[in-house]
Design a protein with these regions (language model features):
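Short secondary-structure transition/capping segments
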Residues: 28-33, 89-93
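Short, surface-exposed helix-loop/turn micro-motifs enriched in polar/charged residues
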Residues: 1, 19-21
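C-terminal terminal-subdomain/extension
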Residues: 1, 64-111
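Short, charged beta-turn/beta-strand-edge "cap" motif at the junction between a beta-strand
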Residues: 14-18
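Compact nucleic-acid interaction/catalytic patches
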Residues: 21-23, 29-64
Length: 111
């Protein structure tokens, strides 16, 4: 399966430790397309349907689309590098504007 930045995929986050996100849930890929084509891992951010308002830059709301059936928050402070084996399927994609906003919020989390 070809994986690109901005793709929303279903990922198995088990096993979890401490306050990490768990479950099989959607996540958005943020690693670059070149890396995604040669590495066996991807960098991604999990999504949650447990919506919390006014939490930027830690969360970013996106609307349902394609096979993402519910509005969701991207959990920007829960960045992960995981094996592609954990990815079950692609279900949607962020728009370019959403992806750019996501990266801006991620940068705020890292400073």
């Amino acid at each position: 399966m070809e994986l690109n930045r901005g793709d929303i995929v279903i990922v198995n986050f088990y096993p979890k430790k401490g306050d990490e996100v768990a479950k099989i849930r959607p996540a958005v890929i943020i690693s670059g397309n070149d890396e995604n084509s040669i590495l066996d891992t991807v960098i991604l951010l999990p999504l949650s349907t447990d919506l919390i308002d006014d939490m930027q830059p830690y969360r970013m709301r996106i609307k349902s689309r394609d096979n993402l059936k519910q509005d969701s928050d991207i959990l920007i402070n829960q960045i992960r590098t995981l094996s592609k084996v954990r990815i079950k399927e692609k279900i949607a994609k962020l728009t370019d504007n959403e992806y750019n906003e996501l990266i801006e919020n991620l940068c705020k989390n890292l400073h």
